[in-house]
Amino acid sequence: VDYNTINVKISAGVHYKITDKLEASINTYFGSGTTVYTGADRYSLKNLKMAQHKFELKHKNWFVRAYTTQENAGDSYNSSALGAFLNEAYRPSSAWFPLYIGTFSEGRRLNGAAASDFTLHSAARASADAGRLIPGTARFDSAASIIKSTPIRRGGALFLDKSDLYAAEGQFNLSDMIGISDKLEIMVGTGWKQWAMNSQGTIFADTAQTIRVNEYGGYLQLKKKLGEAVTLTASGRYDKQTNFDGKFTPRVSAVFKVARENFLRVSYQTAYRFPTNQNQYISLVTGSGVLMGCLPEFQDYYKLNSTLPGYTAASVVSYRAGSIADSSRLVRAQYNEVKPETVRSYEVGYKGIIGKKLMVDGYVYYSEYKDFLVGVAVAQSRAGNKFELYSPFSSTNVSYTQNSADKVKSIGWGLGLEYNAVKKYVVYANVFSDQLRDV
């Protein structure tokens, strides 16, 4: 693995003023690099490339833009898989373990108690490891090169990710356009995105064809001033994604002027989070198990709801702590169709200037999540026999996303201070606290 980090970024743009109020622009951004990422496994992101191209028309009262993001995994590979396949390259596990066990057992038979377990283990390892690939040798480098250049779905470690994003969005200030900005501010907007996942089966379940996921939505915001003392804002947006029902999320807020340069704010907000594309479509075998999508079809593909059911991690740990015959400890994992995560949040805040020198900005909030998205780990036997779960060598760890049955809560507060001490010198201080409960 190359642990050096290289990052190259290039950008270019052309901006043209069509009129005094209308500007057109085209911008291009390109990045390339090499680094190491650690998640479920360790990944060598080598010669990774990413580009974004954007076209925009911008007016005082509106804008429309379209952009695309293109990515290429380059020569990236799963280093954990590389290590495992290198071990298999010189002698498969099906041959290594019998040779190790045979040598250890024969040593015990010939020497009895005169030979320690460590001595027998060393002899067995020496026998089973004979001919093992040694780093720095031509044989090792040749085998590693072949595995690095072979896609994961063909028994190698290479990622083939050339996924793209296409998007268009616009926003319009209707108040100025219809001449009522002094009475009511009206803002509307809309947007569309399409993700095109193309990993050729090395990350996502897209072996047959590119997976396309569409998301679209729109929003409306109204803002009204009641004299100089109160400003009210109300907004709502609707979003829909390919695999999930649409979500409507309203928000309201009020700002009160309690004194000159002193304001109190209160708000109620709702928001949502669709499962990510990775949550939905990943299909990746790692050194520690299988990462699979949360959509119902993955339960069918991996036979979790039929001949190879999954069992909860806690029950498997309990089973392995007892007798192999006591499979009654095992609890079958229940899969529920995943929903978007939603949150309701309440906030009270204050911002003001005290004594013309001290600016204070503080807030407290409370949030409650419903259908919180969490990772679930289950164990699956390899041949449908419960007793296989007693050993990690005859079972498979499987992980996917589910909604939590509990309501997760978040509570927090923050305080920021800015003090003009003497001419040209400003002192800043801030403190905050955030707690996530019932996760």
Regions found by a protein language model. Give the residues of each.
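Transmembrane beta-barrel architecture of outer-membrane proteins
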Residues: 5-11, 48-52, 163-171, 213-219, ...
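Surface-exposed extracellular loop regions of Gram-negative outer-membrane beta-barrel proteins
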Residues: 7-51, 186-195, 209-257, 417-435
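Outer-membrane beta-barrel channels and translocator barrels
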Residues: 19-21, 31, 59-62, 175-181, ...
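Gram-negative outer-membrane beta-barrel transporters
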Residues: 28, 360-439
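Transmembrane beta-strands of outer-membrane beta-barrel pores
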Residues: 28-34, 59-61, 68-72, 192-198, ...
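Outer-membrane beta-barrel translocator domains and adjoining extracellular loop/strand segments
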Residues: 31, 36-43, 68-70, 75-83, ...
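Face-selective signature of the C-terminal outer-membrane beta-barrel domain
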Residues: 54-244, 361, 428
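Membrane-embedded beta-barrel scaffold of Gram-negative outer-membrane proteins
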Residues: 297-396
